[in-house]
Amino acid sequence: MQENNLNNFGLTVFDLKKLKGKRKIKFVQIDTLDQGLAAKESGIEMIGTSYEQSKAHFPQKLKGVHFQFGLRWGNQASTEEALRESMKAMNDGAQSIYCPMSPSVVEVLSKEEIPVIAHVGLIPPKITLTGGYRAVGKSFDEAKMVWETAKRYESAGAFAIELEVVPGKLASEITKRTSLFTISLGSGSKCDAQYLFSADILGEKNDFLPRHAKRYKTLFKEHDKIHNERINAYKEFINDVDNNLFEDKKYSVSMDDEVLNKLINFIDKK
C-alpha cells in the first residue's frame, strides 16, 4: 500500500484484496455525516451508506477511508438502471458499490470495472424466501445454497461479499476457499472485515437490537434530553409571545414619535 493511498483515499479495492487473510478491516454503515466523521476520527477504515443525492457529498467529506455507496434493493429495476446509478455513485467518490441484485447484474457492473460488493445469507428485502429474520445456512441444503451463490458472485466478478447472519464456520470456509473479500455481519469473526451499523454501535434508538449487533453507547438518552430541551424552548417562546415580550426594546427597533406622526398624517391624507 502506498502512503498517499492512506492519506488521500484510505484503503483502495486494490489494498483490500492485498489485505485478505492478513488483518481484519473495521467497517461500519452510517446514516449521517456526523456518524461518518466520528467513525473516521476513531480509526474506522471502511464506511458505507445507501446512495442518495442527499449523501452524494459524503465521500468528499470523509477522505482517508474506503467509502462504499450501496444501491437500495428495489430502486433499480434493470441492469441498465443499476449500471447508471453505480457510475453516478463512483463519480461522486465511492470506491466500491454494494449491489444486492443478481449475479447477472453484478457481471455487467464488473465488466465496466465497477468494484461490487454482493450479499448472501439474510437479505432483509428478500426474507420471505428464507423464512423471515433468521440465520441462513445451518442446514446442509441452505449451506450449499449460500456457498453456491457466493461462488456465482465470484464468477460474476464481485470483489467482495457481505455474509449476513451466516454460521461462522460456513463464513470461514467461504473466506478461505474463494478470492472474495468477505464481510461479516453477524457471521462470526473469521471474515476479512467485521461490519456493524452505526445506529446499533451508538445506540441511536431505544428499540430492537439485532442479536448479532452490539450496543456500545446509549445516545438515544442524549437524543431524548435534547428533544425535551427543544420542547421546553418552544414553550418558553410561546409564553413570551403571549406576554408581549417582543415589544421590549431589546428585541425590536425603536422609532421617534415625531417621525411616526408625520407618517400617519401622510397616510391619512391619501
Q: What annotation goes with each model-predicted range?
A:
Residues 1-270:
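Alpha/beta enzyme core
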